[in-house]
């Protein structure tokens, strides 16, 4: 026997149960295995074939035992024996013509037919059931169907519903052709068919077990990953929520430290060239309560406080009020803390680049809103002298000009001539 395209086992000569077992394994996994019983199990058939060879007046019998047949899916599972008889005529091997006849030998010395088995070739345009039904009508005890030419010893499980009255098996083409040629040479061939082994259910049970275990493993892995992913997202969300709450608390603390001022009639912010709040884009009016940030920008208190609570930065220059006020902030996921101390001198000595950027974007300045709260000019001069002495001491070979800090360069033109003279004196 041998495998049909995609199914089966190729056998040569006395190939037996091992290859049939492999064929049954492929059959059990094949989606093309029809029939209720065939879908559950495949039964092999033991074949005991004998040739009675006349030789010099003495008959000699040659026996050949092998497991090379497969019971049809609708065939009775029982033993049967008889002389193999092909259909009459060279073109009738397929037994598709309902008028096909079989020449059955008789018992020696009588007209009683011997028990016989129909040897029929697969194909011809009719079904397995038609072939088996015809053999049963002609009186055969069983039907032996061999495969197409060119398929060697390949076999398939036959499905023949409605033709389950007699035993029906399939054998390979090479085996069937060999028997047919022997019969055509006048050799009487007898076959004894015995029920072989049942194959398939253990394969199905194993397949079900394997699929069940695989499904359980995949499901468990999927559920485990989903739980891990969900727990990780929940943990990150909680950490982010805690961080946001902490930052809001720090922002409230920082907002409480920022300076408030009530604008009065005559302040520069209210004059003809007065500024407007960068948040609400409205001009300042007398009695407006404004918040002065660490970067010297001012805004309406009601406008900037909600912004600072959420963003903690100046709406204009993005100056971080938490760092500017030295309030402890969390870095990344809260595992590291950073304390940024800021003194009055550090907050009042920004780099020239920062001063330039602020002067370009600021519409209001800390120096312009402090009014009567500005420190005396002498304090500015003294602070500038100290900075100049410190730089000259640290860099002896490098000439450094230190420009005294002005809170908002935008309003430098408002300085008095005395202040300009003091600055020139400091530079000299």
Curated annotation (Swiss-Prot):
Compartments reported by the entry: Cytoplasm; Endomembrane system; Cytoplasm, Cytoskeleton; Cytoplasm, Perinuclear region
Domain PA, chain residue ranges per copy: 75-183
Reactions mediated catalytically: S-ubiquitinyl-[E2 ubiquitin-conjugating enzyme]-L-cysteine + [acceptor protein]-L-lysine = [E2 ubiquitin-conjugating enzyme]-L-cysteine + N(6)-ubiquitinyl-[acceptor protein]-L-lysine
UniProt GO BP: negative regulation of cytokine production; protein ubiquitination; regulation of protein stability
UniProt keyword annotation of Ribonucleoprotein present: no
Gene null: resulting phenotype: LPS stimulation increases macrophage and neutrophil infiltration in the alveolar space of RNF128 knock-out mice.
GO molecular function, one term: zinc ion binding
PTM statement from Swiss-Prot or TrEMBL: Auto-ubiquitinated. Controls the development of T-cell clonal anergy by ubiquitination.
Tissue/organ expression: Expressed in brain, kidney, heart, liver, ovary, testis and thymus. Expression increased as early as 4 hours by 5- to 7-fold in anergized cultures as compared to resting or activated cells.
SUPFAM superfamilies in the record: PA domain, RING/U-box
Domain comment (free text): Binding to E2 ubiquitin-conjugating enzyme requires an intact RING finger domain.
Function: E3 ubiquitin-protein ligase that catalyzes 'Lys-27', 'Lys-48'- or 'Lys-63'-linked polyubiquitin chains formation and plays a role in different biological processes such as modulation of immune response, cytoskeletal dynamics or protein homeostasis. Inhibits IL2 and IL4 transcription, thereby playing an important role in the induction of the anergic phenotype, a long-term stable state of T-lymphocyte unresponsiveness to antigenic stimulation associated with the blockade of interleukin production.
Name under which the protein is recorded: E3 ubiquitin-protein ligase RNF128
């Amino acid at each position: 026997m041998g495998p049909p395209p995609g199914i089966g086992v190729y056998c040569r000569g006395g190939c037996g149960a091992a290859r049939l077992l492999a064929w049954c394994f492929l059959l059990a996994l094949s989606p093309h295995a029809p029939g209720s019983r065939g879908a559950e199990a495949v039964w092999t058939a033991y074949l005991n074939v004998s040739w009675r060879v006349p030789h010099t007046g003495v008959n000699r019998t040659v026996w050949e035992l092998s497991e090379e047949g497969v019971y049809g899916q609708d065939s009775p599972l029982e033993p049967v024996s008889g002389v193999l008889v092909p259909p009459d005529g060279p073109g009738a091997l397929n037994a598709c013509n309902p008028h096909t006849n079989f020449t059955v030998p008789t018992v020696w010395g009588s007209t009683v037919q011997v028990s016989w088995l129909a040897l029929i070739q697969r194909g011809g345009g009719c079904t397995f059931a038609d072939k088996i039904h015809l053999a049963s009508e002609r009186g055969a005890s069983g039907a032996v169907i061999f495969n197409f030419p060119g398929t060697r010893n390949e076999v398939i499980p036959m499905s023949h519903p409605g033709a389950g009255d007699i035993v029906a098996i399939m054998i390979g083409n090479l085996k069937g052709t060999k028997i047919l040629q022997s019969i055509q040479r006048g050799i009487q061939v007898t076959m004894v068919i015995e029920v072989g082994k049942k194959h398939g259910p253990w394969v199905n049970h194993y397949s079900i077990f394997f699929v069940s275990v695989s499904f359980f493993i995949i499901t468990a892995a999927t559920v485990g990953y989903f739980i891990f992913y969900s727990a990780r997202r929940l943990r990150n969300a909680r950490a982010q929520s805690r961080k946001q709450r902490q930052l809001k608390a720090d922002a409230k603390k920082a907002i409480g430290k920022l300076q408030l001022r009530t604008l009065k009639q005559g302040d520069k912010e209210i004059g003809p060239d007065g500024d407007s709040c960068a948040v609400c884009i409205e001009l300042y009016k007398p009695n407006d309560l404004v918040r002065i940030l660490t970067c010297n920008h001012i805004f309406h208190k009601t406008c900037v406080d909600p912004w600072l609570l959420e963003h903690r930065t100046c709406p204009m220059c993005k100056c971080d009020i938490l760092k500017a006020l030295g309030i402890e902030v969390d870095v990344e996921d809260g595992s590291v803390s950073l304390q940024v101390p800021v003194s009055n001198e550090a907050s009042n000595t920004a780099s020239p680049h920062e001063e330039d950027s602020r002067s370009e974007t600021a519409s209001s300045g800390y120096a312009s809103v402090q009014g009567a709260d500005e420190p005396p000019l002498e304090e500015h001069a003294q602070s500038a002298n100290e900075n100049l002495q410190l730089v000259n001491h640290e860099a002896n070979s490098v000439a450094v000009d230190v420009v005294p800090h002005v809170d908002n360069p935008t309003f430098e033109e408002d300085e008095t001539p005395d202040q300009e003279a003091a600055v020139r004196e400091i530079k000299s």
